[in-house]
Swiss-Prot record:
MF (Gene Ontology): DNA binding; zinc ion binding
Top-level lineage group: Eukaryota
Residue spans, zinc finger RING-type: 165-203
Zinc finger residue extent: C3H1-type: 107-135
GO biological process terms, semicolon-separated: generation of catalytic spliceosome for first transesterification step; snoRNA splicing
The protein's name in its UniProt record: Pre-mRNA-splicing factor CWC24
Subunit relationships: Associated with the spliceosome.
Gene coding for it: CWC24
Job description of the protein: Involved in pre-mRNA splicing.
């Protein structure tokens, strides 16, 4: 039933094992660390380079090895000093002047309901997604020039108004303004219309009517203060 094993099966085969050969470790060349020059050393190098004008020439091949070395050391020292002195721009927030801290919002497409602005009625009613406003919006350049126009009008008006009453040749006392736009003292105007109701300046018939010159009262007070 059972097969007898042969004697040859009990023998073991010899296997040749090759040992790996260890390669000699390759030594990497040591990296020379360049010394950091201080400011005093840089100053000495600058004096030495300034005394030798050939260092500033581009023909490095004509210069000697000492000159080239000093020039490179100077560039390295200047670069190292600049990197250490300048702060990193991305690490800190740039501080701006107080008068420049403005928040400007420009709406190039105002979502205003066109139908409601033109007619005052919108078929969508409260469900309209646009703004129901009938205000008049001015452009930015128009707002910037409005104050200049008002200032010019004020200067023109001040130049047109005499700084003293033309009847009494004195400062205005309770000034009045006629329908033709001329200014007089109240007392002078009353005395004038008793004789002649025409304007003393243009000759137009005033019909004895004049109103208080409220726009001239601040000017009159300023002249009195002076």
């Amino acid at each position: 039933m059972f097969k007898k094993r042969s004697a040859a099966s009990k023998t073991r085969k010899r296997v040749k094992v090759e040992t790996p050969v260890q390669k000699p470790a390759v030594q990497k060349p040591a990296v020379a660390v360049k010394p950091v020059l201080d400011k005093s050393h840089v100053a000495k190098l600058e004096e030495e380079i300034a005394s030798r004008p050939e260092l500033d020439q581009k023909a490095v091949g004509e210069a000697d090895a000492t000159a080239v070395r000093l020039k490179r050391l100077k560039e390295q020292a200047t670069k190292h000093d600049r990197l250490n002195s300048e702060p990193v721009a991305s690490s800190k927030k740039i501080q701006q002047a107080a008068n420049l801290r403005n928040t400007i919002l420009t709406d190039f497409q105002p979502d205003v309901c066109k139908d409601f602005k033109q007619t005052g009625y919108c078929g969508y009613g409260d469900s309209c997604k646009f703004l129901h406003s009938r205000d008049d919006f001015k452009a930015g350049w128009t707002l910037a020039t409005d104050w200049k126009i008002d200032e010019q009008k004020e200067e023109t008006r001040k130049e047109a108004v005499p700084f003293k009453c033309v009847l009494c040749k004195e400062s205005y006392e309770r000034p009045v303004k006629t329908n033709c736009g001329h200014y007089f003292c109240q007392k002078c105007f009353v005395n004038r219309i008793k004789i002649d109701k025409s304007c003393f300046i243009c000759g137009e018939n005033t019909e004895g009517i004049a109103k208080m010159a409220t726009d001239l009262v601040p000017m009159d007070n300023a002249n009195k203060d002076k």
